[in-house]
Amino acid sequence: MTPPAALGPVVLDVAGTQLTPDDRRRLCHPLVGMVILFARNFTGPAQLAELCREIHELRDPPLRIAVDHEGGRVQRFRAGFTHIPPMAALGRRWDEDVLDACKVALAAGFVLGAELRARGVDLSFTPVLDLDWGRSAVIGDRALHADPRVVTVLANQLSHGLALAGMANCGKHFPGHGWAAADSHVDVPVDERSFEAILAADAAPYGWMGTGLDAVMPAHVVFPAVDVQPAGFSPRWIREILRGRLGFTGAVFSDDLCMAGARVAGDVVASAQAALAAGCDFVLVCNDSAAADQLLAHLQWRRTPAFDERLARLGPRDGPPAPAQVLQTARYRAALQDLASLGGGPTPAR
């Protein structure tokens, strides 16, 4: 595999369903390493495949393409893709039948990963490892369960399904967004609990998943008992606790630096520098083209061997498979059948 030496730490979005001249200019900047897609970038599977082809052909080695495609209300692509139920449905199945829940979680990961890979998407920011404390509306049914042991087992199964489809995983939102009630898209959530309480519950899956966890996205949540900075800007959380105490060796993605929860660090350049200094490998800048241009003009960054190793671990190991290679296989059909028992099924193409 060609080493990803030409790719940088910035993750940007694009305007629409085709690349504009401004998109191309930004994506060809050496600081950019990845593109994140949203629902506005999608009209159907064929269009998505063509957009991904455009993006991949811009650079050598190709830019990585990511998406938030968890299932439930956070599933960016719908028409022509299988409906993935919210992750809480897997938790409810666990309460009824542990082994069946494990089987369906694996099927969900495989279907999710296979369908994205067949259209050219390289990475989905999933699984959600937040606990369902019944307090956070922005998390809510995105969480698998209230018990961190159950979350770990189901997330491992879902991640195994992703891996079978050739896709890495990304656990979020470290160390946990399930307790703080505020939404970090529009506010700065605060979790006042003790470090011991957070480590024993919310952060536990990040340690228990071990080397099976490829990437992590920290929360824009402040935990005053540990640090006055949100976790995504905190060397204590990322370097000392996530990497040092929990032994995590994969990539760390900041959450979107244009969210309200990230503004405590300053403008987009200051926020990106703070996130990278805290231990993030990649920084996301979404839905603000002026901020993206400002960041590309002023960000100071130095490549390290650790960055290249973590980027390579995210894959993919090769180009996207032809849809027929995956979507007409017996394994895919069996996974669809398993997922249907949870309410998953096809969404009609437009």
Model-derived segments and their meaning:
Residues 43-49, 95-114, 146-154, 196-199:
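Glycine-rich anion/phosphate-binding loops
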Residues 56-85, 105-131, 151, 155-175:
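Glycine-rich, aromatic-flanked loop segments that form ligand/cofactor-binding clefts
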